Amino acid sequence: MKISRQAYADMYGPTTGDRIRLGDTELWVEIEHDHTHYGEEVKFGGGKVIRDGMGQSQRCDDAVMDTVITNAVIIDWWGIIKADVGLKNGRIAAIGKSGNPDTQPDIDIIIGPGTEIIAGEGQILTAGGVDTHVHYICPQQVDEALMSGLTTMIGGGTGPATGSVATTHTPGPWHLGKMMQAVDDLPINIGFLGKGSASTPEALEQQIKAGAMSLKIHEDWGAAPASISNALDVADRYDIQVAIHADSLNESGFVQDTLEAFKDRCIHTYHTEGAGGGHAPDIIVACAMPNVLPSSTNPTRPYTINTVDEHLDMLMGCHHLDPNIPEDVAFADSRIRRETIAAEDILHDMGVISMMSSDSQAMGRIGEVVCRTWQTAHKMRVQRGLLPEDEALGADNFRAKRYIAKYTINPAITHGISHEVGSIEVGKFADLVLWKPPFFGVKPSIILKGGMIAGAAMGDPNAAISTPQPVHYRRMFGALGKAVSATRMTFVSQAAMNTGLEEKLGLKSQLVACKNVRQVRKCDMKLNDACPVLTVDPQTYEVHADGVLLTCEPATELPLAQRYHLF
């Protein structure tokens, strides 16, 4: 029996060779492989396949999956494929073909009476996003992050304290302990950055043992070469990451002095374009270093006609500056440069800037990491055409993989947690996001944390069915009660694990140590490892890569924007 491609896609979702438009962007991806066996597809519902003795076996719990996501299109850094995904004990157990091995051939994922089904037909499945630049200013950020498709937050803060509003630090053992207790029942994975701005190691070591998974150097606390070198020395001893917001004022040295202080050691450079902070006007050249792991924050993503106008007031508010003091205004002005913001777009498209993050409530928007990433990809598709890697296929597969890596696997690798999160791979924590293609990148349909549905777009709870309006994002059962602590993690250093911190603080959530951090290099950034020679003209701020001027026009209109937020 044969059916048309359209009928097949309507029933089981698209298959190999079919193309999907991502939201209302100009990005199209083509399915590279389908794990199904045509004629043996499984689907749940009345008169469908997943029924007793058909697609559902008689096998007991130890042999079957807890949950199977059927016929989903997976978009990840490693590929764009169609598959069933099996979840067991909160982790990804298998990617392949599901069903009943007693009645069907070549089954990888067994469905039984103990299996729940999530219909992925016609939907896109991605790994939960990892935001590595979060100011913990208010706990309500968690809902905004989760419902946008983020499942891991790394940052610092203690609430709306002046220091936290400006800088991503949770300083000192007392604050670290209290914040770890505070987030213990929040339905998202969290890691804390300790304050790294110090010239001697003892206070930094205290914070690492108290639960900091990384250290953060920030110019508002001091980003002199001595502080940088000291923090990296400590990080080398404890196998943790250092993140840096460098010296915008060039008080203690210029960009070359900071790069020399790194001494070829790996470091995560925040908002590497510079509008968020860093040596003016040329911090962007750090992107070219083989030891630097560069990220952007989303307020400059992508470059539009409104980007520059928005930034001045944001910057004044975040960094406790006074608009009546000329020096403060000059400081703010020095960080906002059209030329470097325009170059940032292209550096992302070239795979030079490896990561995307938010800078939540401190110039950035935590709920827009995902959509700003895809808006940037769209803008570059429109302005630069297909990437060379995509020309043979004629679809945007490589570009899609490059951009999704920026907020999933690469931040996870950078901070030593890619063994747990950051991609859809067997053995990893089942932090997954399901999207309907028209809403891809802006409004997910279901968010799973540790294999359990934690958030979803849900209709009126008093309605006869689940879809009537008003439909908005609500916490689901995975975000309630004791299920929360069973489906989330707090990331710490191995040194903190060795102190018995979990018992000492009375934590219910699992503590997981970051690892293999200090060996990470730019070449480890998936699909985003380019290191061209970058220069910045000190007078015009023009950016060149290998001698080629990087410039583009600001966007006047973007996808994934107002048409999705009318209600």
Swiss-Prot record:
Disulfide bonds: none
Binding positions for Ni(2+) 1 per the UniProt entry: H133, H135, K216, D359
Required co-factors: Ni cation
Database matches in InterPro entries: Amidohydro-rel, Metal-dep_hydrolase_composite, Metal_Hydrolase, Urease_alpha_N_dom, Urease_alpha_subunit, Urease_asu, Urease_asu_c, Urease_Ni-bd
Keyword hit for tRNA-binding: no
Domain Urease: 128-567
Protein name: Urease subunit alpha
Native species: Pseudoalteromonas translucida (strain TAC 125)
Species lineage: Bacteria, Pseudomonadati, Pseudomonadota, Gammaproteobacteria, Alteromonadales
Gene name of the record: ureC
